[in-house]
């Protein structure tokens, strides 16, 4: 099944599969997915919004027919399919503790119908009991584990007893919240020991070290902390299951804030380093990975990747490592003599083989030098590449390595960004901004006494998209949530951190329902 791809936010949409921005699923989509190297798809389906009343909880025949059609299309294209129960987990299954008998009866009825419908399908169809299970109104994890074990056991028995191909079909069981903390893994391991079924796999989800994955608390880079979080997570999963011969499916992986409609939250090169490392380490730990894609990676209308270079990095990671660098950005000042610029190469077991600018191979010694892991771009080369030094990207280089995909390096001319005065209400404040070639990394917010300001009160570095945004080339926007969290009448100093290393300070004050901002 490795590697896998999620048909995300499609058969959870209301009222139909196109309601959340994706087109109707076609055979061509699965042909594209298969041609790109994927061997399996995960098919998230929400059933409860297409069910009748108790006690039968009959699934709408038209809905069942639609799901059957999509399963068959994927199977026809020689893909493995993992079919699940998806948003039902928080729409009604989460009430198992407070409405036990009703929820369990509905769960039984739902899986009884699904199992009967697909009992004779190819063994390449696998079934997953529930997505991201959680329970409301419980006394804590001990009760949560007991409830999940009950659900998984009911699911297992219904499917196995339904006969046909279901007697030995691969079944996939999640941890609580599909989380990989040790207690979650241990609880599921106990369940598996009780089931004594060799055709059961486990699943967890992984979206990276949370502060990096959403850009909060200053974690703008895929650094040692983020890397250690990934390796520790995959090690725990490996030791709990794959080392004991139990398959593991990382049923969803991506970055929480990655979206083609919201560029800049996670810097592009840092994204690439994350996906490169994740793919390699999952392979080393023998984990099956399924990319969560609700349309942010593959444009399902054009059937083209929204960022072909990013997907090339993901695809390469399934089989080999790639070289990267400390950054994919080299910033040059708008005026004045240019000096040589250094980057640190992350060879990842590869050999550095040179630099290219378009079809031209740069000359070692004249255009760049390499000393150990230090790559130095000479002042003369940068001067030629920068040309008239217009703001923004002046040239794009490719660092080539002995294997994997090239590393892109943008040569960027910049000057200190300029933020202008602004006024408005607490619903949001648009701060006119001349970025002048630079790119925003994060925003720090403090009151005059040094204490943190903003909804994330535990850190001065606020969360992109929750406290601020910068999706256009002419403004930084402070959100209503950020402004509403500010103390009335207390000045806040914002420090905007840019990828060039430049910092720009700005003052903002809320007075009742009004907000004013001015350069510091």
Task: Tell what function each PLM region has.
Residues 7-25, 54-59, 98-99, 211-227:
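Acidic/histidine-rich helix-loop elements
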């Amino acid at each position: 099944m490795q590697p896998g791809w999620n048909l995300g936010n499609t058969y959870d949409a209301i009222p139909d599969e196109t309601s959340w921005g994706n087109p109707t699923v076609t055979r061509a989509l699965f042909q594209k997915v298969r041609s790109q190297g994927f061997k399996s798809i995960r098919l998230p389906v929400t059933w409860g919004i297409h069910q009748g009343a108790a006690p039968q909880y009959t699934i709408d025949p038209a809905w069942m027919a639609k799901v059957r059609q999509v399963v068959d299309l994927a199977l026809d294209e020689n893909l493995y399919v993992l079919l699940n129960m998806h948003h039902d987990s928080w729409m009604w299954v989460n009430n198992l503790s407070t409405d036990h008998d009703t929820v369990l009866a509905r769960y039984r009825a739902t899986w009884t119908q699904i199992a009967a419908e697909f009992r004779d399908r190819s063994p390449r169809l696998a079934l997953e009991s529930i997505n991201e299970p959680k329970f409301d109104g419980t006394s804590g994890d001990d009760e949560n584990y007991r409830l999940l074990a009950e659900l998984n056991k009911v699911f297992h028995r219904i499917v196995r007893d339904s006969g046909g191909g279901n007697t030995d079909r691969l079944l996939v069981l999640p941890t609580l919240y599909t989380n990989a903390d040790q207690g979650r893994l241990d609880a599921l391991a106990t369940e598996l020991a009780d089931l004594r079924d060799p055709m059961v796999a486990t699943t967890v989800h992984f979206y990276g070290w949370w502060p990096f994955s959403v850009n909060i608390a200053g974690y703008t880079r895929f650094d040692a902390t983020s890397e250690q979080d990934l390796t520790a997570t995959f090690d725990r999963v490996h030791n709990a299951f794959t080392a004991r011969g139990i398959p593991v499916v990382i049923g969803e992986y991506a970055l929480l804030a990655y979206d083609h409609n919201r560029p800049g939250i996670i810097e592009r090169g840092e994204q690439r380093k994350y996906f490169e490392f994740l793919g390699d380490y999952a392979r080393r730990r023998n984990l099956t990975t399924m990319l969560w894609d609700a349309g942010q990676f593959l444009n399902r209308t054009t059937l083209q990747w929204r960022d072909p270079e990013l997907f090339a990095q993901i695809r390469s990671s399934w089989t080999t490592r790639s070289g990267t660098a400390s950054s994919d950005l080299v910033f040059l000042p708008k005026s004045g003599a240019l000096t040589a610029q250094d980057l640190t190469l992350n060879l990842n077991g590869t050999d550095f083989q040179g630099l290219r600018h378009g079809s031209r191979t740069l000359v070692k010694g004249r255009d760049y030098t390499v000393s150990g892991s230090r790559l130095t771009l000479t002042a003369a080369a940068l001067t030629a590449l920068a040309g008239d030094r217009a703001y923004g990207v002046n040239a794009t280089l490719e660092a080539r390595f002995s294997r994997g995909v090239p590393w892109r390096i943008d040569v960027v001319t910049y000057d200190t960004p300029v933020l202008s005065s602004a006024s408005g209400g607490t619903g949001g404040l648009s701060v006119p901004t001349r970025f002048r070639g630079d790119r925003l990394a994060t925003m720090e917010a403090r009151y005059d006494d040094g204490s943190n300001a903003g909804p994330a009160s535990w850190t001065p570095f606020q969360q992109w998209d929750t406290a601020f945004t910068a999706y256009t080339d002419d403004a930084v926007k402070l959100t209503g949530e950020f402004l509403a969290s500010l103390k009335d009448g207390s000045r806040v100093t914002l420090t905007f951190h840019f990828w060039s290393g430049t910092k720009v300070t700005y003052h903002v004050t809320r007075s009742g329902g009004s907000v004013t901002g001015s350069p510091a």
